[in-house]
UniProtKB/Swiss-Prot annotation:
Enzyme Commission code: 3.6.5.4
Catalytic activity: GTP + H2O = GDP + phosphate + H(+)
Gene3D superfamilies, per the entry: P-loop containing nucleotide triphosphate hydrolases, Signal recognition particle SRP54, nucleotide-binding domain
Record's function text: Involved in targeting and insertion of nascent membrane proteins into the cytoplasmic membrane. Acts as a receptor for the complex formed by the signal recognition particle (SRP) and the ribosome-nascent chain (RNC). Interaction with SRP-RNC leads to the transfer of the RNC complex to the Sec translocase for insertion into the membrane, the hydrolysis of GTP by both Ffh and FtsY, and the dissociation of the SRP-FtsY complex into the individual components.
Residues reported to bind GTP: 184-191, 266-270, 330-333
Name of the gene encoding the protein in the UniProt record: ftsY
CDD domains in UniProt: FtsY (cd17874)
SUBUNIT field: Part of the signal recognition particle protein translocation system, which is composed of SRP and FtsY. SRP is a ribonucleoprotein composed of Ffh and a 4.5S RNA molecule.
Protein name as annotated: Signal recognition particle receptor FtsY
Superkingdom as given in the UniProt entry: Bacteria
InterPro entries on file: AAA+_ATPase, P-loop_NTPase, Signal_recog_particl_SRP54_hlx, SR_rcpt_FtsY, SRP/SRP_N, SRP54_GTPase_dom, SRP54_N_sf
SMART domains per UniProt: AAA (SM00382), SRP54 (SM00962), SRP54_N (SM00963)
């Protein structure tokens, strides 16, 4: 760092702290999904059985409900275990290296310089990194903190808080059709993600329709049609080279007339620096609104985590054009650049709906900030 930065950024080193406060660094589990109370469920069942004339269907309903809760919890736990395995490279590149900084070290300028370096190398980004470190320094001054281990847990809490703000699951409303517009640059796994979403929502009992608006790529149309046939999901498509807005117009009208629950629109991958292609997305939105003024109800950007800080510029341009309502981060399995998730969350505060850790449908899961932190940090 430059001398000017040291004098200003770390001026806390020479200041005298008059008041000491105790800092509580215990981490509260904020994930309500872990708070399922099975005891309450079986207490109701026991009370019902003790009745003089219990109804068998009522007991069966409670039994089924208990099994559903257990199945949902097992699915959640399995995804968490796979997430931890998938983020091993990011953990090694970010979590482990940061942890080493705090081992048996005093809190001084050198510690913060090393922390800054590791965070930048992990693709957390300069703005987010500086904001986190600046806030840590303020806490050190305020609390007269001397213990580096406590400072480490305080860092984890700050990084958790950044992610918690964007942990907002996508809720499909009863509006028919609920239109999801999926956008992104080439190679992010957009079409594959569309298929995963379709299969996931179908398993939830919703009727699904897909629109193959990636008309620039014949293989993309064929891929979506094949995935639709495999899952018995209708796909609205036209020949390669057709106007994508025309495909989407037909799809929205068809979904509306057939009372489809969810319509997912796969658009062509487009470079964020090709302004005419970004303008085409605006045209697509206008076409959708001609049929349903409230649609699209969700505008999802697919982000490839392997692209690191390049995703920041992509998100900025797509968000400016469409006012994005959600993000899906793909290819977290094996990437060393998982730190970009913090940068995305901090700079844009757009809800992260899902994260992808593999090719299978079950490898697309709801984003959980607590699990993400636990998967990366010791």
């Amino acid at each position: 760092m430059k001398d000017s930065k040291k004098n200003g950024f770390f001026s806390w080193l020479s200041s005298k702290i008059k008041k000491k406060k105790t800092i509580d660094i215990r981490q509260n589990n904020t994930d309500k999904n872990h708070d399922i109370n099975h005891e309450d469920l079986y207490t109701k069942k026991d009370l019902l059985i003790k009745q003089d004339n219990p109804k068998k269907d009522e007991i069966d309903t409670l039994n089924d409900h208990g099994k559903d809760i257990e199945k949902a919890q097992n699915t959640k736990n399995n995804f968490f275990l796979r997430l931890k395995k998938s983020l091993k490279t990011t953990k090694k590149n970010l979590g482990d290296k940061i942890y080493q900084i705090f081992l048996s070290k005093k809190i001084d300028e050198v510690l913060f310089e090393e922390l800054e370096e590791k965070m930048l190398l992990a693709d957390i980004g300069i703005n987010t990194t500086n904001r986190i470190i600046s806030n840590l320094i303020k806490d050190v001054n305020r609390e007269d903190l001397k213990n580096s281990e406590k400072l480490y847990f305080l860092l984890k809490r700050k990084m958790f808080n950044i992610l918690k703000k964007v942990e907002i699951p996508l809720e499909i409303s009863s509006h028919s059709p609920f239109v999801i517009l999926v956008v992104g640059v080439n190679g992010t796994g957009k079409t594959t993600t569309v298929a995963k979403l379709a299969e996931k929502y179908k398993l939830e009992g919703k009727s699904i329709m897909l629109a193959a608006a990636d008309t620039f790529r014949a293989a993309g149309i064929e891929q979506l049609q094949t995935l639709g046939k495999l899952n018995n999901i209708p796909v609205i498509a036209q020949r390669s080279g057709s106007d994508p807005a025309a495909v989407i117009f037909d799809a929205v009208k068809s979904a509306k007339s057939k009372k489809i629950d969810v319509l997912i629109i796969d658009t062509a991958g487009r470079l964020h620096n090709k302004l005419h292609l970004i303008e085409e997305l605006k045209k697509i939105v206008r076409v959708i609104k001609k049929i349903d003024i409230s649609a699209p109800h969700e505008k999802l950007l697919i982000i490839d985590s392997c692209n690191g800080q390049n995703t920041i510029q992509q998100t900025e341009i797509f968000h400016k054009a469409l006012n994005l309502t959600g993000i899906i981060i793909t290819k977290l399995d094996g990437t060393a650049k998982g730190g970009v998730v913090f940068s995305l969350a901090d700079q844009f505060q757009i809800p992260i709906r899902y994260i992808g850790i593999g090719e299978k449908m079950q490898d697309l899961g709801h984003f959980n900030s607590q699990e993400f932190i636990e998967s990366i940090f010791t």
